């Protein structure tokens, strides 16, 4: 392959990555819209942190990461951030 072809391929792959990033951001936005709905369904701050649910989510994403040949530690760290941000959001919205 020539250098020119490599540059074209690199640009194409980067564009593909950018498109995937855009989809990921949209999906994260969708996830947080659902968290807003959950917030409206919870009646008290005692309901914000569900340790059983958190454990289930983290085990689930870890398993899915392994099946997709992705480092599960990376995925768990990302989901821990999602969970922390959801807890912050719920804490700020739930009054009781």
Predicted regions mapped to residue ranges:
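Domain-level signature for soluble enzymes in the chorismate/prephenate branch of the shikimate pathway
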Residues: 1-96
């Amino acid at each position: 392959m020539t250098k020119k072809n490599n540059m074209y391929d690199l640009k194409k792959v980067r564009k593909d990555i950018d498109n995937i990033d855009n989809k990921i951001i949209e999906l994260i936005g969708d996830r947080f819209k659902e968290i807003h709905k959950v917030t409206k369904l919870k009646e008290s701050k005692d309901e914000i942190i569900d340790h059983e649910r958190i454990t289930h989510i983290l085990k689930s994403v870890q398993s899915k990461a392994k099946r997709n040949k992705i480092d599960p530690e990376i995925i768990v760290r990302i989901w821990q951030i999602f969970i922390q941000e959801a807890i912050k959001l719920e804490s700020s919205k739930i009054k009781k």
